[in-house]
């Protein structure tokens, strides 16, 4: 598939955020040929290192925002695709509309903040309707949900957040919370394992 490389990079960025101890979400913008032209990752709990166009250490330092911020305003992007590992929130949906992108694909579901069903009813949005596709019904979607839930568990997310995930995506929640999951991801984090190794290891949790 022409987006396979873009999806791999998106998962790689999410895994980088997981290793850095922050919200594990990755996002890229792909051109009509599937080439990555912009990228970003979640940096909410990382200190700002001065990287141009990349928000960090604030509530809005989302992967999609950091990817879309790389697009120059000198053209429109109706023929480009925004790919993200997790169902985007309402802020990131609004940013996608502002960017002129009209196609958004997401890998994993977010039952708490995900806003894929939200429809922006403005003249601007009607001019360039945003078509949203997801989740992915394969190992990529499973991995995206798994590392997000594992991160929520590790970093003590509020009970309403955890309950929303347990109700909304119970299979992914059970796999992320089963015995051995925490130690597995601690080991991968300690080894600074590459994303392909992490996906392979995570498959042991998702195969049951």
Where are these regions (language model features)?
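Zinc-dependent deaminase
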Residues: 1-17, 99-208
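Immediate flanking context of iron-sulfur cluster ligation sites
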Residues: 76-86
């Amino acid at each position: 598939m022409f987006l396979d490389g873009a999806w791999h990079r998106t998962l790689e960025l999410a895994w980088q955020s997981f290793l850095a101890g922050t919200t594990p979400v990755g996002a890229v913008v792909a051109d009509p040929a599937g080439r990555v032209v912009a990228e970003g990752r979640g940096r909410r709990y990382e200190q700002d290192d001065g990287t141009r166009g990349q928000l960090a250490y604030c509530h809005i330092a989302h992967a999609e925002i950091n990817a879309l911020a790389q697009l120059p305003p000198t053209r429109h992007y109706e023929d480009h695709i925004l790919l993200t590992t997790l169902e985007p929130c309402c802020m990131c949906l609004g940013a996608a509309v502002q960017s002129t992108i009209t196609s958004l694909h997401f890998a994993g579901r977010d039952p708490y903040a995900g806003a894929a069903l939200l429809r922006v009813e403005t003249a601007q949005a009607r001019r360039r309707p945003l078509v949203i596709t997801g989740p992915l019904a394969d190992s990529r979607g499973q991995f995206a949900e798994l590392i997000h839930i594992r991160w929520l568990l590790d970093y003590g997310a509020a009970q309403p957040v955890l309950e929303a995930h347990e109700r909304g995506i119970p299979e992914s929640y059970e796999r992320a919370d089963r015995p051995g999951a925490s130690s597995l991801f601690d080991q991968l984090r300690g080894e600074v394992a590459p994303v392909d190794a992490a996906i392979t290891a995570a498959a042991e949790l998702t195969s049951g």
